[in-house]
């Protein structure tokens, strides 16, 4: 029985899921908006929101924790120099999920996941 087990399996084993969400979190931090399936977007929130909360207080220990979860120095630098200060006054809710229809091949529900308070000068990338 799977009573009270949280998180989606997404038809992947645990190491694949961990690597996928690490890569997706890095992409979201780098581009600030990505397009993915709705279940993956909802699950990605659980990875990205704690990373941004971690980035609100800049310390060596927090930078190492963020690096352990993303494995990308460029992403860690952006988290602590841009995103941490940007969301310093916000107590959670750093991401927004916008549904955008269904994928052509298999009718999977698709969604954009983006960081709120995103600068408007960037063009939206798909």
Curated annotation (Swiss-Prot):
Name of protein: Large ribosomal subunit protein bL17
UniProt cross-references to SUPFAM superfamilies, sorted A to Z: Prokaryotic ribosomal protein L17 (SSF64263)
Subunit structure: Part of the 50S ribosomal subunit. Contacts protein L32.
Entry annotated with the keyword Iron: no
Domain of life: Bacteria
GO biological process: translation
Cell cycle keyword on record: no
Keywords: Ribonucleoprotein, Ribosomal protein
HAMAP family: Ribosomal_bL17
